[in-house]
C-alpha cells in the first residue's frame, strides 16, 4: 500500500473487500487506529485487545445502550455486572451444558440431516445459502422451543436485528427496518413467554420463565431481551464458522485428509477456523476514564473497537499466524472453547461467549454429517469465493460438489 495506513480508512470498501491484507500493517504501524468519521479507535494488537476485554471496569459495554438495546428490547448479558451478570449468565448457561447439551445433540443432528437431504441426490449445494443459514436458525429455535415452521420469518426478523447491532452506521431506512423487525419479534415472542409461565417445558424460554433473580421471577422484558440475545449470539456465527472451516480444509487437502481419517481432529479444525477467520470481527467497548492503549492516550467515553481478526493473526501470540494449520502447537485446544481460549473469537474475560461449548458441539456434529454425507466434497468448478462484512464476516456463498447418494 502506497498510502499511509494512518490515512487509510478501515470503513472503506477497499478494506472490507479483504481486511486481512491490512492487518499486519495496522498492527505494526498504527495499532491504535483512529477513524475521524465516527470518532472511534480500532485496536489491532493481540495483547492490547486481550487487555481491553479483560478489564470491563475501564473498557465498558456502555455503548450497547445505543448499539443494542433499541432492538434487543432491554439490556443484554454483556451490559450486566456483578450479581446480576453472574445470576442471569448462570441461568442461560444451564441450557448450554451437561444434560441440556446432551438433549440438544439429537436435535442438531436431525436438523442437519433433514436440511441436507434434498441436496444429496443432486450432488451439489451452497453450504451457506442452501443450508447453513437455515440450519443455524432452526437449531436455535429448537433450543428456545419455538415452532420451526416459522423459521423463515424468524430468520428475516433476526437479520434485521443483527444488521442494527453489526452496522457501524445505518441509513434511516435501514434503521427503521431493524426496529420494525425487533417489534415483530417482540409481538411473536411475548405470547410464548406468557404461555411458558403457565405450561413450562424443558426449553430455554421455559427455563427463563421459571428462574429467579434475587428471589423474584424475571420480568417479561428481561426474558425477551435474553431470548433475543441468545437468538442473535447462537445464530449469527454458526453458519459462518461451518462454511469457513469447510472452505479452508478444502484449500488445504492434506489437512482435510487428516480430518477425514481421524474425526477427533474436527474440534481442532473448528478452533483453528475461529482463530484464523473469526466470524465476529469487531467487539466495541467504551472507556469509563481517560487511559492509555498501545501508547496512545484515549479520552473517557471514547468508543474503541477490538479487531478480533487482526489480534488472532498477531505473531506475538501465534507462530506463522497467517497460515491455516489445525495441528499448530499454540492452538491451546484444551481451552479453545472456553473463556480461557488463546484465540479471541469468543471474546475474553467475564463477558466471553456464554455458548462457546454449545457452538463447538453444534459445529462438530454438523461438520461430521457434512463430511459423511457429502463424499469426495470439493469446490464447484469456476466457483469464485468471496467474503463480506466488517463487524461480522463470512462467506457470501460456498458452492460445493460431491458424490451423490
Curated annotation (Swiss-Prot):
Reactions catalysed, as given in the entry: cyclo(L-leucyl-L-leucyl) + 6 reduced [2Fe-2S]-[ferredoxin] + 3 O2 + 4 H(+) = pulcherriminic acid + 6 oxidized [2Fe-2S]-[ferredoxin] + 4 H2O
Cofactor(s), by name: heme
GO biological process: pigment biosynthetic process
Cited InterPro entries: CypX, Cyt_P450, Cyt_P450_B, Cyt_P450_CS, Cyt_P450_sf
EC number: 1.14.15.13
GO molecular-function terms, A-Z: heme binding; iron ion binding; monooxygenase activity; oxidoreductase activity, acting on paired donors, with incorporation or reduction of molecular oxygen, reduced iron-sulfur protein as one donor, and incorporation of one atom of oxygen
Keywords noted in UniProt: Heme, Iron, Metal-binding, Monooxygenase, Oxidoreductase
UniProt entry tagged with the keyword Heme: yes
Pfam families with a match to the protein in the record: p450
Residue positions binding heme: 62, 229, 285, 353
UniProt similarity note: Belongs to the cytochrome P450 family.
Function comment: Involved in the biosynthesis of pulcherrimin, a red extracellular pigment. Catalyzes the oxidation of cyclo(L-Leu-L-Leu) (cLL) to yield pulcherriminic acid which forms pulcherrimin via a nonenzymic reaction with Fe(3+). Substrates with small alkyl groups (cAA, cLG, cLP) exhibit weaker binding to CYP134A1, but substrates with larger hydrophobic side chains bind in a similar regime to cLL.
Subunit structure: Homodimer.
Protein name: Pulcherriminic acid synthase
